[in-house]
Amino acid sequence: MSHEVPNAIDVRNAVKRYGDFTALKTISLSIRDNEFFTLLGPSGCGKTTLLRMIAGFEDVTEGEIFLYGEEIEDLPPNRRPVNTVFQNYALFPHMDVMENVGFGLEMLGKPKAQARARAGEILELVQLSQFANRKPSQLSGGQQQRVALARALAPQPKVLLLDEPLSALDLKLRKAMQLELKHLQRETGITFIFVTHDQDEALTMSDRIAVMSAGELQQLGDARDIYEKPANRFVADFIGETNLFEVTIKSRDGTRVLCAFLNGLTLTCDAVAGMDVGDRVHMSIRPERIKLRSSKVETENFQAQVVENIYAGTDVQTIVHLQGGMPLAVRTQNSEIGRSMTFEPGAEVFVDVEFGSARLLAN
């Protein structure tokens, strides 16, 4: 008989207030066992507050938090089977790497020999065995990050909390650490809860993402759903790049609606429940879902003029102006095919929006 594994974390109607200020407004979400879960949002959205509530560093004003079915909001941090990796790593400068990693185990009452053996295992996992006798000051930023990870993983917590741990690293090292973190999570089987404001980090590493803004949960889903099917204007604008327009729904035909832009142009897209003819809503079109052509091939092509090409290495962003000077960003790959679809400033072109790429959004 199979037994269903409970969720690693269940947050139920959690509220956090500081005096008259409400930092978290009735948040409910579940994080699965062995999941890489990301809390994503801009500064001040409440993501770190929620992480600290799970860790026990912040009290819960209202609501409940469960860890593998056990209610924990009243437990002190040292009685919760979680560990936290902080943004500043918090390594002990007077201890070498081996001592730093084994410190938590010794505090839990493990014999020194057993603590060193476990520290050696985890250092091998993070590929730092050769640096075991070095002090933190003798390590690079990326190596210090891996020591902090090793120290947090050594006691084998049920959940690992990571509070923007990559923000101090340069771009290339940050990219490498993203892959390493994902690998570590898979190797250890421990649930990771990762806090970041970086959309690329979230999309690269996460099994699922909770997008937060102003203390509220805006959307929860996997990376593809969050990017391809944003729940509202905030998510569409915050995740990746997009063109946002205010439109009016002019007519409906089954599952499709005809929308009019402020400049009078119209575009057909999928209908969305709760939106009716006459409603003024927002439309999102991702730049990579738009093609520029030298001649008209579809009935809904828009005529436009190229204003600027912005070279970005792997791709090129082209800014065009539609009727009435309405700007539109188009992104093409920097490849032979992509270059054949790039036009010089001043060129008259036709804009081809792939059907299904325009998405209507709640305000």
UniProtKB/Swiss-Prot annotation:
Localization recorded for this chain is: Cell inner membrane
Record: residues binding ATP: G41, P42, S43, G44, C45, G46, K47, T48
Pfam families on file: ABC_tran, TOBE_2
What Enzyme Commission number(s) apply to this enzyme? 7.6.2.11
Q: Name one GO cellular component term.
A: ATP-binding cassette (ABC) transporter complex
Q: Which PROSITE patterns match?
A: ABC_TRANSPORTER_1 (PS00211), ABC_TRANSPORTER_2 (PS50893), POTA (PS51305)
State the similarity comment: Belongs to the ABC transporter superfamily. Spermidine/putrescine importer (TC 3.A.1.11.1) family.
Q: What is this protein called?
A: Spermidine/putrescine import ATP-binding protein PotA
Q: Which gene encodes it?
A: potA
